[in-house]
Each structure stands twice: as C-alpha cells, then as structure tokens.
Amino acid sequence: MQFEITTEYIKLDSLLKGVNIVGSGGEAKLVIADGEVRVNGVVELRRGRKLYPGDRVRLGDHEFGVERAAGAV
C-alpha cells in the first residue's frame, strides 16, 4: 500500500495514524518503542523519524510505501 504525502516528509508516528494502523499517538509511541516497526527493513525506535518518498514502513503484516502526491511541490 502506498501513502501519499504533499510535504517534504512525514513523521513515523503521523504515518501510522494516517494509515489507521494505530488509533492514537500514544498507541503509535508504544508499538514503536516495543520495536515492532521497521523502516526500510531496520527496526526504528524513534517516533519522530522523518520519512521521505521511497521509504518503506512495516508493522506486522502491514507494509506501506511513502510517495509524493501528484502535483505536490
């Protein structure tokens, strides 16, 4: 699944909320702190990690790619 952004980057916790895989920022913080999230195949423990187009995020059986929205600067 692809997640489109209109800005230069999106923070990891915001992406997890944006794809509705977590219900809140607190829940995002917990799954990240527990080492359940991988960015580009590497466990990521920073909820503020900046994600750019081309980055891949995985949580359990869910995987998301970050891409620039059409027409975004």
Per-segment meaning from a language model:
Residues M1, G35, G60-F64:
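Generic structural motif recognizing short loop/turn segments at the entrances and edges of beta-strands
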Residues M1-T7:
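A detector for short, charged/polar N-terminal pre-domain segments
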Residues T7-P53:
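A basic, amphipathic helix-loop patch mediating RNA/tRNA/ribosome contacts
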Residues E44-V73:
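C-terminal structural segments of small proteins and small subunits
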